[in-house]
Amino acid sequence: MSGRIFLAVIFLTFVAATASAKTRVAEFKGSGNTTTAIFRVESPWVIDWRLDGDYEHMMGLEITLIEAKTGKHVGRVLYTKRRGNGVKLFHTAGLYQLRVSSTLARWTVKIDQLTREEAELYTAKGSN
């Protein structure tokens, strides 16, 4: 009997962990300009970015989304000249790369796959 309970607990723990957790697809870090490795995502997904630097008024970061197969410019994801962090939600699946351009800055970009339920929790500022 205790063996069945143990197996049930293990199974429920596994199901709960896989059903509710976002999945890290890729993470990129740097302090200069680069085009990232190719990554594949399903809808929905987010770009989670962070920017830091030593020169408050001289730093900058621009991130552009590129379709990996064609090299087509999908759009600018971010342009900032200030320290900070944020997320951008996407509803399109695909094979992508990021083109990152930075000036006097250290940046981190994480690509996270979400469930539909997790995506519903993301709302834009001021959209109450």
Regions found by a protein language model. Name each.
Residues 1-2:
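N-terminal secretory signal peptides that target proteins for export/translocation
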Residues 20-128:
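Acidic, Ser/Thr/Pro
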Residues 16-18:
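N-terminal signal peptide c-region/cleavage motif recognized by signal peptidases
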Residues 5-14:
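Sec-dependent N-terminal signal peptides
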